[in-house]
Regions:
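ATP/NTP phosphate-donor binding region
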Residues: 1-82
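Structural motif
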Residues: 3, 25-27, 54, 81-84, ...
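Active-site nucleophile and cofactor-binding loops and adjacent substrate-binding regions
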Residues: 60, 86-88, 248-252
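Short Gly/Thr/Asp-enriched flexible loops that form oxyanion-binding sites at enzyme active sites
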Residues: 72, 91-105, 138-141
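Glycine/serine-rich anion-binding loops at beta->alpha junctions
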Residues: 80-96, 130-136
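A glycine/threonine-rich phosphate-anchoring loop and its flanking beta-alpha core
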Residues: 103-200
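Active-site segments that bind and position negatively charged phosphate/pyrophosphate groups
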Residues: 192-255
Length: 255
């Protein structure tokens, strides 16, 4: 089960979970600019200053299979024990893909296409979202593109061990980014609510997400958006992710 640490400034509490990464080799998966822009880099630089950290950001938005191959090769060469993803949906997907393929990179493409069971690499996954949209930190799915085809991996092994939801980290996103991300969360909540696979629990999560979107989405688009609103949208995205994690996606999600 994923442990969620939620609150404004919560990333600074990572130090309280040092047992998860102390004296271990950490693969830090990040975006090229968002890691610094969000303020996460400055916080983690202090917390992880004495740790053995290897950063990987050599991949595109909506990761391609070739990107994942490079990530796995980098992680295996570093002999990592922990994966820490700091970023949006593509960053989190990349971290999940590296974990999924870590033990069996030679057969990774076949695993994706055949939906084979994944081997457990015994690597912890810590996730810090810096966008409020995909809810990927709450799901057991990862998306990868092979050529022009979009594939989805699904395994309980892809659920993070620990997630930090910190509204401060999305404060530097542009209004356009926040609008796109917010509509992503809203759409996922609606999709989950009417999905054939919905349950009483998933519907509860979906409606929590919808209520938070209604309350906070207009507010986060303002230049002086308060942390409360930013954090509210981060929680909305997480609830939408928890909902879709249960109900699964519908045809609309293929685009």
């Amino acid at each position: 089960m994923t442990k969620i640490i939620s609150g404004i400034g919560s990333l600074e509490k990572l130090i309280d979970f040092k047992d998860q990464f102390f004296d271990k080799r950490i693969l830090l998966v990040t975006g090229k600019g968002s890691f610094s822009n969000s303020g996460a880099e400055l916080i983690l630089k202090n917390i992880l200053r004495n740790e053995c950290v290897f950063r990987f950001s050599d991949f595109e938005v909506n990761p391609k299979f070739e990107d994942a191959e490079r990530g796995v090769a980098f992680a295996r060469e570093a002999n990592i024990d922990v994966i820490m993803a700091v970023g949006g949906g593509s960053v989190i997907d990349m971290a999940k893909l590296i974990k999924a393929f870590y033990l069996n990179p030679e057969n990774a493409q076949a695993m994706v296409k055949s939906k084979a069971c994944l081997l457990d690499p015994k690597v912890s996954l810590i996730v810090v979202p810096t966008t409020a949209g995909s809810g990927s930190e709450a799901t057991h799915f990862a998306v990868v593109h092979i050529g022009k085809e979009k594939y989805s991996l699904a395994s309980p092994l892809l659920l993070p061990n620990t997630v930090f939801l910190d509204g401060k980290l999305i404060s530097t996103c542009s209004a356009y980014q926040k609008a796109c991300n917010g509509l992503d969360a809203l759409a996922q909540a609606i999709e989950s609510a009417w999905a054939v696979g919905s349950t009483e629990v998933s519907i509860k999560y979906a409606f929590k997400a919808l209520k938070l979107c209604k309350k906070y989405l207009p507010k986060v688009l303002k230049d002086d958006a308060e942390y409360e609103a930013l954090h509210g949208m981060l929680e909305a995205a997480n609830f939408a992710g928890q909902a879709i994690n249960i109900s699964k996606t519908t045809a609309a999600h293929a685009w």
